Design a protein with these regions (language model features):
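Structural recognition of the conserved hydrophobic beta-strand(s) that form the central parallel beta-sheet
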Residues: 1-7
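Charged, glycine-rich active-site and insertion segments that engage polyanionic ligands
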Residues: 7-113, 117, 124-186
Length: 186
């Protein structure tokens, strides 16, 4: 019998998964994680964005060293705003988005960050007093929350979940992001 540990149970084959013993650990508190990354010299906005993607400090720090995450974050925010205000421009904006998110890791980070943007809107909509992932955009987030219905937000969550699946199945990233625009918030 071999002992194996995995932090990605979704990548284990079903036949093996059924024979596994599952042990779940509570992930680090998001606020603590963000503060830890800030202490490690990341900017708060980048740390907040990375907290949507990982709870592993090493992963977050290496991504920050390898890539220009400040620029990626700005592009993601711009694209999210286009999704809500001008869908035809959001389709065109995919080109800029994928120029920044040029590999699978960054594309998954982008999807997680987009999900975080809509999570903030949902928190504002239900008036949950939690920390926003995009703390510097709280005014804009609340404005979007007033204009979106619960059904629109749920539809967007469904599209983002589907996009994650498709990206993990190696579907062309342009097609994945186009589907978010086409089938997302209307």
């Amino acid at each position: 019998i071999r002992d194996r540990l995995s932090t990605k149970p979704e990548q284990i084959l079903d036949t093996i998964h059924s024979r596994c013993q599952h042990v779940y650990f509570k992930p680090i508190d998001k606020g603590q994680f963000i503060n830890h990354l800030v202490d490690e010299s990341l900017t708060r906005p980048v740390a907040e964005m990375l907290s949507t993607y990982t709870t592993q400090a090493e992963t977050a720090l290496s991504l920050n060293e390898e890539y220009d995450l400040t620029s990626l974050r700005k592009t993601i925010i711009r694209w999210c705003e286009l999704l809500l205000t001008n869908r035809s421009m959001a389709l065109i904006g995919i080109i800029d988005l994928l120029k920044q998110a040029k590999n699978r890791k960054l594309q998954l980070l982008t999807l997680s960050a987009v999900n975080g943007f809509f999570e903030d809107i949902m928190h504002a909509k239900v008036e949950v007093n939690s920390e926003y992932i995009y703390s510097d955009l709280s005014v804009e987030i609340k404005k979007y929350a007033k204009h979106l219905t619960y059904n629109q937000l749920i539809l967007m969550y469904d599209q983002l979940t589907e996009a994650h699946k498709k990206l993990n199945q190696n579907v062309n990233p342009t097609l994945v992001f186009e589907q978010i625009v086409i089938k997302g918030v209307r």
